[in-house]
């Protein structure tokens, strides 16, 4: 069931800067969505328009089928967890979480019960009387979430709310946020520039750049099938090579012809080819599909990050559980399904239509 719809949303500021360009998206109830992109991509502007903090220059915002474009933020069934959490330092945990209910003059017995339930949901039982200054960053974030969910919103917006935490806490809170969302069954819209966060938590990701949605889909679809150079580079590490389509399921790059899994592209058309570093296997030279010479390697704990130069001068990035010798010539092997072919300038709609066409011919 659709809960949020943005219909041809544009945002242009007084100085002429266009932050959003004809944004269209539909969000279903009870899912975890991420708006992913670099600084200035428009992701936070979308969040603020949904929340009612920023007015769109054009277009409509719908909530549960109702036009809320001009509805005051305080009247929307939407709450926000801000990047800095926006907790009141002079109030303790209980008072922070209870704040919205006290403003609405709810009975004290109801407030106590709801604060207890909210703190239990975020695993802060026994913290009600703690001062905010006594809490860790992760605990402060949980208080902010408890405060945001206490009045049972239908949608929770989270604006870069993991960015201030260290790596270990960020990982921990990824699991926490996903668990909270599933327990509550409400729609989460999470803004981030961190592709790992988006991939780990989301049901669906919207990748933004320059005020436009470049691609949307499940984490697996976006990682395995990027529609353009920007998405391929922004979502994970990639080897991106210039190539030429030979025919359906055959492509040329690095001076050789390879079997691939792509079709629906004109024979002879120039394309870009994506190979993920973790899909490349290091072999003996004779067993590889291409030969490369190792230039450097870094041990990153669970794998080696290896840079190597191909015979055509292309610099390859390879992730391997086995180390190699600097200067060593090795082979690299990959399967046809590991090769992803991108048409130059193809939109997401054109990519989807092509995919449906050749999959329908199987």
UniProtKB/Swiss-Prot annotation:
Its main location: membrane. PROSITE patterns: ABC_TRANSPORTER_1 (PS00211), ABC_TRANSPORTER_2 (PS50893), POTA (PS51305). It catalyses: ATP + H2O + polyamine-[polyamine-binding protein]Side 1 = ADP + phosphate + polyamineSide 2 + [polyamine-binding protein]Side 1. It comes from the Bacteria. Gene3D superfamilies: 2.40.50.100, P-loop containing nucleotide triphosphate hydrolases. It holds the Pfam family TOBE_2. It is a peripheral membrane protein. The keyword ATP-binding applies. It is an enzyme of class 7 (translocase). InterPro entries: AAA+_ATPase, ABC_SmlMolc_Importer, ABC_transporter-like_ATP-bd, ABC_transporter-like_CS, Mo/tungstate-bd_C_term_dom, P-loop_NTPase, PotA-like, PotA_ATP-bd. Residues 4-235 form the ABC transporter domain. Its EC number is 7.6.2.11. GO terms for cellular component: ATP-binding cassette (ABC) transporter complex. It is found in: Cell membrane. GO terms for molecular function: ABC-type putrescine transporter activity; ATP binding; ATP hydrolysis activity. Keywords: ATP-binding, Cell membrane, Membrane, Nucleotide-binding, Translocase, Transport. ATP binds at residues 37-44. The keyword rRNA processing does not apply. Part of the ABC transporter complex PotABCD involved in spermidine/putrescine import. Responsible for energy coupling to the transport system. The complex is composed of two ATP-binding proteins (PotA), two transmembrane proteins (PotB and PotC) and a solute-binding protein (PotD). Belongs to the ABC transporter superfamily. Spermidine/putrescine importer (TC 3.A.1.11.1) family. This is Spermidine/putrescine import ATP-binding protein PotA. It comes from Lactobacillus delbrueckii subsp. bulgaricus (strain ATCC 11842 / DSM 20081 / BCRC 10696 / JCM 1002 / NBRC 13953 / NCIMB 11778 / NCTC 12712 / WDCM 00102 / Lb 14).
